[in-house]
């Protein structure tokens, strides 16, 4: 008997318009600052924006809700590609659980030890490593971000099976990139755009055509438009054969909802 899996062999990155798809195919992925709430750690109401590229590990047959929440456009790449690039599944956490309390306690201990200047360098490094782990955490469920605060649709985030790419802390430090933005900085649209532009010029999450398993567009009418865009943006970089294979991987949202 063949073994079946709940997860997919493809990591999907969803977006809300075809221009974003074309931009990714042209310039590859770049991290963008996204708001996250760490209230689930307890004892704090921390809300900050972290640079990341998000994916979901959901089979096409179960992707309807994700399309409704995140848009009818997506690029799906092989999970092998994701693992090779250091993309990691999110650790979902429940407030007041033993594991969440353990993380919170470690953070509190590190903060207290920072008062000792002799230990400051070691503690700073430990704090960086801990933050790097925490940035891959997400509450099991809660309100989604809605323009200015977390008062959007109540969502069981666990069902999204999120994977994240977050830039390595050494790269962040080398290029003097902000590891996170305070909420006020994120809400400043002009400032946020400058932060996103800076990081996109330095950090790329690259891929090859063979890594792409699906390109999802909202309607079949857009497939021919995307054909032409692929010819224009990849013609100098990829062979005609690879471009033609890539075109066969375009599918519409309607096909998914009707056939899977």
Tell where the protein language model's regions lie, with residue ranges.
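NAD-dependent ADP-ribosyltransferases
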Residues: 1-260
């Amino acid at each position: 008997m063949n073994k079946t899996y709940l997860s997919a062999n493809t990591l999907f990155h969803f977006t809300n318009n075809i221009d974003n798809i074309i931009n990714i195919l042209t310039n590859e992925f770049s991290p963008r600052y996204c708001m996250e709430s760490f209230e689930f750690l307890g004892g704090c109401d921390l809300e900050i924006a972290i640079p990341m590229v998000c994916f979901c590990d959901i089979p096409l047959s179960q992707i309807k809700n994700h399309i409704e929440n995140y848009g009818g456009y997506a690029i799906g790449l092989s999970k092998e590609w994701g693992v090779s690039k250091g993309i990691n599944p999110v650790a979902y956490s429940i407030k007041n659980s033993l594991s969440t309390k353990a993380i919170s306690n470690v953070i509190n201990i590190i903060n207290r030890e920072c008062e000792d200047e002799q230990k400051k360098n070691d503690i700073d490094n430990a704090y960086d490593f801990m933050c790097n782990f925490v940035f891959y955490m997400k509450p099991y469920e809660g309100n989604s971000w809605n323009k200015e605060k977390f008062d959007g649709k109540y969502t069981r985030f666990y069902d999204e099976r999120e994977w994240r790419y977050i830039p390595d802390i050494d790269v962040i430090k080398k290029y003097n990139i902000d590891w996170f933005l305070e909420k006020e900085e994120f809400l400043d649209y002009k400032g946020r755009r400058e932060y996103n532009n800076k990081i996109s010029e330095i950090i790329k999450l690259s891929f090859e055509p063979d890594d792409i398993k699906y390109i999802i567009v909202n309607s079949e009418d857009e497939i021919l438009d995307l054909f032409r865009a692929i010819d224009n943006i990849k013609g100098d970089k990829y062979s005609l054969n690879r471009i033609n294979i890539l075109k066969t991987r375009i599918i519409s949202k309607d096909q998914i909802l009707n056939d899977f």
